[in-house]
Regions:
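Conserved, short, structured surface segments that act as functional micro-motifs
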Residues: 170
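Right-hand nucleic-acid polymerase module
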Residues: 1-167, 177-245
């Protein structure tokens, strides 16, 4: 049977395009790699995206003797949820931005370094397990002299309109510091590095991470964003953000 593919409206950003396809492309549902799937391909809970109202009619204790009511849009904030995955993306992108921003504040005396978005692609990766890929990545990072970075795993690449995922595992990194990209690096690893440019502001970091999470690999028990080096959980403590309904 033929499948209906939605055409992307003019003016859509790449992020909006991925969000639309996550919700509506029939091909995303069947994209699987070593336990990883794509965002929004699970089941929503009964309360997801429903308005919940709380109230108190103890008017004697209220200013101006008025009733009190509060309305909240409920969200499970889970990557697999077709209704709430954007809430998960926003919260995770905000957490990553705050972590990287706090690290940069502590490095104020070295302003010439910003986080840089790079893509690391291994050879013949479609037949490797994630465990083996991760082990090879660790070696590759050492050869490239990458110590401090945030890592987002992408099991798939996509066709032009982002509707059809094709298995092609690779890693997106937000890297701090100098990256060694030489002939020697390629000869030792056979991995390729693609430099996507510096992230100059917090907004750049947030937009980049949000975009990456819109079509990343998600798997229960595995962090969608991994932090290494000086931004790791062990080395950098960041206060939790306030409550988001």
């Amino acid at each position: 049977n033929s499948q209906t593919i939605l055409v992307t409206p003019p003016g859509f950003s790449a992020y909006q395009n991925y969000i639309q396809q996550a919700q509506q492309s029939p091909y995303w549902k069947n994209a699987l790699y070593d336990g990883f799937s794509l965002p929004a391909q699970g089941q929503a809970k009964e309360y997801c995206k429903k308005w919940i109202s709380y109230g108190c009619d103890n008017v004697k204790q209220h200013p101006n003797k008025q009733h009190y009511a509060e309305h909240t849009l409920k969200s499970c904030k889970v990557a697999f949820c077709p209704k709430c995955f954007e809430s998960w993306i926003g919260r995770q992108a905000n957490r990553t931005t705050r972590r990287l921003s706090k690290f940069l504040e502590s490095r104020e005396i070295r302003k010439h370094y910003k986080f840089r978005h790079i893509i690391l692609s291994p050879p013949n990766a479609d037949k490797m397990s994630y465990k083996k890929l991760k082990r090879n990545l660790d070696f590759t990072l050492k050869v490239a002299n990458i110590k401090t970075c945030a890592i987002v795993f992408h099991p798939f690449r996509f066709n032009k309109d982002k509707s059809i995922p094709v298995r092609s595992p690779h890693f997106h990194l937000l890297v701090y510091g100098h990256v060694t990209n030489t002939t020697e690096f390629y000869n030792k690893t056979k991995w390729t590095i693609k430099n996507k440019g510096d992230l100059k502001t917090d907004k750049d970091i947030f937009s980049c991470v949000r975009y990456l999470l819109s079509h990343c690999g998600v798997r229960k028990g595995t962090h969608a964003v991994r932090y290494l080096g000086d931004i790791s959980y062990r080395k950098l403590k960041v206060e939790k953000e306030g409550h988001i309904p």
